[in-house]
Amino acid sequence: MSFDLIIKNGTVILENEARVIDIAAQGGKIAAIGENLGEAKNVLDATGLIVSPGMVDAHTHISEPGRTHWEGYETGTRAAAKGGITTMIEMPLNQLPATVDRETIELKFDAAKGKLTIDAAQLGGLVSYNLDRLHELDEVGVVGFKCFVATCGDRGIDNDFRDVNDWQFYKGAQKLGEMDQTVLVHCENALICDELGEEAKREGRVTAHDYVASRPVFTEVEAIRRVLYLAKAAGCRLHVCHISSPEGVEEVTRARQEVQDVTCESCPHYFVLDTDQFEEIGTLAKCSPPIRDQENQKGMWEKLFNGEIDCLVSDHSPCPPEMKAGNIMQAWGGIAGLQNCMDVMFDEAVQKRGMSLPMFGKLMATNAADIFGLKHKGRIAPGKDADLVFIQPDSSYVLKNEDLEYRHKVSPYVGRTIGARITKTILRGDVIYDIEHGFPVPPKGQFILKHQQ
């Protein structure tokens, strides 16, 4: 039999093992896995390379429309492809207007036409002002709903994102549970974090360590505990976003042991950066929850290897450089990171700490696809989309600003020596990024809607 594509001689990450085996693709799908698969129009030799499922990044901010000067579909999805991401799940905030109903999500679809290098699923927003319109987003096909119990949004802009209070969260979660949807939550105690931050500013405490102290671990843990209880009472699946502390992970683990339907994610920056590095890097490493100390980081690695964290995500949330000016307490909080999720974590988790390749595949792709119902994504298996990434192990390089595809070529990882490289990214059987030839085909990404799964 003749196929469109055969990948030969690579070490392939399968669900429960990794071994040297060939992959055949036909019509954008994985058609066969094995040896001596026959002929193909295109044959790629992956000798010495790891062949991974394309990353499913379940937490990405593309600020188009309305704030395209922060990040746009063209630049953001090219960076994703260069970093081995083949599917992103896009957050409903940072763009203007926020994605809170049918009209605003249609604006996203229109803005992205002809610009998607990778595939994209959408999240709707659960905000203080759209409880009567959640069904519109469900009908369009979002794969989940994001909300904040921490303070968010520009109060001077009417159609910006807004956090929810406990009543709004509970009522929204009730509605979403009835729709068989998942609610995703940014968990920090709004009032305490706000007051601690204002107190620090008044007293002139504006260093990285001061910022971290203004958002202590207990503010994350309290919020996680609260939304777990409310989501359970409301009858809604819960996904806890970007957990930064082992104590926060323990709350999720405890709830799972009590048979609550809950999952969680974390981000590479919580595993590879610490507060001292944050102080050195400056505002480019500011995010919330904040990057914490080495002892906290050690605990996060233990939770990751124990299987208590479901997936790793970028939380890519860039902004124009001028918004990172000034002291750390004043600067915008958000990290530009999606281009370096896979290579950094392959280096740190697999090469330096001995994580198995199947576990790496689950954390970067499989689990996120399962959590959000992306049935064609996240696995190297017959019938799945042929979304694949070639990783060259033990191949060190120093990340430079000019390597970045973002609209603004800045990242807290610039200057870092990374011990692995993404050499090729394949989306539905077509090479969309190659380390030698760049981006060889026009953007072919498409939106993934829940009801089409």
Swiss-Prot record:
Q: How is the cofactor bound?
A: Binds 2 Zn(2+) ions per subunit.
Q: What is its EC number?
A: 3.5.2.5
Recorded catalytic reaction(s): these are: (S)-allantoin + H2O = allantoate + H(+)
- Which interval of the chain is the signal sequence? none
Tell me which UniProt keywords the record has, alphabetically: Hydrolase, Metal-binding, Purine metabolism, Zinc
Question: Which Gene3D superfamilies does the protein's record reference?
Answer: Metal-dependent hydrolases
Q: Name one GO molecular function term.
A: cobalt ion binding
Organism domain of life: Bacteria
Q: What does this protein do?
A: Catalyzes the conversion of allantoin (5-ureidohydantoin) to allantoic acid by hydrolytic cleavage of the five-member hydantoin ring.
Q: What is the name listed in the Swiss-Prot or TrEMBL entry for this protein?
A: Allantoinase
Q: Which organism is it from?
A: Salmonella gallinarum (strain 287/91 / NCTC 13346)
High-level lineage: Bacteria, Pseudomonadati, Pseudomonadota, Gammaproteobacteria, Enterobacterales
